[in-house]
Amino acid sequence: MAQTVVVGLGRSGQGAARLLQATGHPVSVIDSGQGEQLEKKAEGLRQQGVEVQLQAPLAIDSFRPWLDQLQRVVISPGVPWDHPTLDDLRQRGVAVDGEMAVAWDALKHIPWVGITGTNGKTTVTHLLSHVLCQAGLAAPMGGNMGVSAAEMALNLQQEHTTAPDWLVMELSSYQIEAAKRIRPRIGIWTTLTPDHLERHGTVEAYRAIKRGLLERSDHAIFNADDPDLRQQRQSWTGGTWVSAESAQPDGHPADLWINGKGWVCDRSQPLFPAEALAMPGAHNRQNLLLVTAAARQIGLSPASIVAGLRSFPGVPHRLEPVGRIGNAQVFNDSKATNYDAAAVGLKAMQGPVVVLAGGSTKQGDATGWLEELNRKACAVVLFGAGTEELHGLITGANFTGELTRRTDLTSAVEEAVRSAEALGATSLLLSPACASFDQYRDFEARGDHFKQLIHQVQSGLN
């Protein structure tokens, strides 16, 4: 009988294995790791009838027990799509899919909103799901954050509930690359700046992956304020273009924009005031327009959209307020895992700001981030594996504020609190500009630790 092997015991791998097993597909899982936590995950799947092999690297030898029956291999987002072993399997006639493709097969009867982009996609995903749900639609979110798409499919099957009206799915370049048959009803492209180049090689390759999702969408929505997307506009026919800056971005008419009086407008009339969304920053005005365009495409009235915007609580780890320490408002922006996202967060702050930055550095242009540091920051506290590299970048940009180095976030928070008080900062911001994997499982774990440390400081002051 045709066999499927799932590579990786992470969240997406577990979800894919459980979904395949529940839908009658013989499935096994391999993972190169070992240890107590991984063994617990493996045992949980074994109890559900899924064979799991640990300490099994991504090599042909790991697949030999099933090679005669092997029909498909399902990879987690962290596995390179062009890995030599996967190419070997393809040459043997084995199909290679990502977890998102498995989920699509089970969920394609429900209309999807597929949201991608270098930055902004998490906020747009949360906000759109919230607006739709507030309007009475069942529109759960998942994908690259929260519940994996495979877990969502499995939960819907097991609960035997009425199918949702919409699925609001955040899709990373890794997921899109490994699931080219996904065809969303609505596709949203938030931004495009260089990221994940260590995986994709070039900006052109990275762009092409994201573009593919929008080309396969029935209706596409674009952020005309993003320089890269704006340069591509001539190559697109149709779609909805939004701008928080102008009714005529780069000489082309926008379909939805914010006018000089602060109102969201379409080509026929003003719709509602943009202040309906109380989140700071120009980037969130762009996010507001992308969500509004999608909600109107789905059929919501301006009044319903406004009600959802006004009740939106915000996104964890994205400029998330964490109270005050002295005169400084504290923000958790752990989701800022690259220079561009960190610069966007800094732009939304009122200075002077004490910034905590660090982690695993990524390839990318740091120019905009360094400019914002010079403009807004009175002090920068560095921590983690990228400390020396970031220190060199910041000193090379002639930063005139305090610049200190610490080994970890705990000691960095202590230093940042001291600096904020001594320098009279109005904001204290965790804005790593780096991935979290040097010291944390993911950016959520890093942000949660930051909030815990801040709450400890606040408790000591009370």
Curated annotation (Swiss-Prot):
GO terms for cellular component: cytoplasm. Gene3D superfamilies: Mur ligase, C-terminal domain (3.90.190.20), Mur-like, catalytic domain (3.40.1190.10), NAD(P)-binding Rossmann-like Domain (3.40.50.720). Keywords: ATP-binding, Cell cycle, Cell division, Cell shape, Cell wall biogenesis/degradation, Cytoplasm, Ligase, Nucleotide-binding, Peptidoglycan synthesis. The keyword NADP does not apply. ATP binds at residues 117-123. It catalyses: UDP-N-acetyl-alpha-D-muramoyl-L-alanine + D-glutamate + ATP = UDP-N-acetyl-alpha-D-muramoyl-L-alanyl-D-glutamate + ADP + phosphate + H(+). The keyword Lipid metabolism does not apply. It holds the Pfam family MurD-like_N. One of its GO terms (biological process) is cell division. Pathway: Cell wall biogenesis; peptidoglycan biosynthesis. Its EC number is 6.3.2.9. GO terms for molecular function: ATP binding; UDP-N-acetylmuramoylalanine-D-glutamate ligase activity. It is found in: Cytoplasm. Disulfide bonds: none annotated. InterPro entries: Mur-like_cat_sf, Mur_ligase_C_dom_sf, Mur_ligase_cen, MurD. Cell wall formation. Catalyzes the addition of glutamate to the nucleotide precursor UDP-N-acetylmuramoyl-L-alanine (UMA). Belongs to the MurCDEF family. This is UDP-N-acetylmuramoylalanine--D-glutamate ligase. It comes from Parasynechococcus marenigrum (strain WH8102). The gene is murD.
